[in-house]
Amino acid sequence: KDSIIDAIDEIYKKLNDKKSARASVFRKKSYGIEQNCVTTGLPAYKRYDDVFLSRESYVKREWSKDEKQDKIKNTISDIIKDFSECKGYKFTKELEELITEKGNNSYVAIVSLDGNKMGQKIQHMKDEARKKEDKNNMAESNNIYIAKLKEFSDNIKKYYKNAFIDMLNVIDKNYDKVSESLKLKDNIMPVRPIILAGDDVCFICNAKIALECVSLFIKSLNKHSVEDEQLNAC
């Protein structure tokens, strides 16, 4: 039986080859005789909230409605549910509710964080697994590596999720001061998660608290280690 490590490496090689050989992304969007989508520039499919949207944008907005999001269980929906139901916060979808001051002070921050040295951590795990491979019993060696890989993935997901929750908890504990400083209304949480997928994190927040939010997130993350290395992000 072949090594699962070799099989995974081969899959990633084929994936990279496919990405490198992808077709041109250029395409004709309009013939100049139709109404265009305000978001994508593609031909409009339907009027939605007084603006024209392509079918792509229309479907996305429909699925962004709360009642449909609730059907999809994921990290973001779990966090929003906990902080909404248990602590009464509202996670807005409107940037205007995050940008509480107008004019020169109307700034919003888009924060994107990515785990540091993840490739090195995975390579270290692979190297250690290689040393312990039993060529006479590859099935067992493969099962051990699969379990190790799952543990690695689960830990990354857990630690990054917990770091985000820790950040929100600090905002919660200081909400009166934060709310007064940012002029928040209706118990708005000044942070809106966009992506929480393993070590890929993206959220939108009021620009005044962006650096502090990042600092809180990274400090929480630094408390944990994977493959004998401290977790970090930038």
Kindly label every feature range from the protein language model.
Residues K1-C234:
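Regulatory and interdomain segments flanking nucleotide-handling catalytic cores
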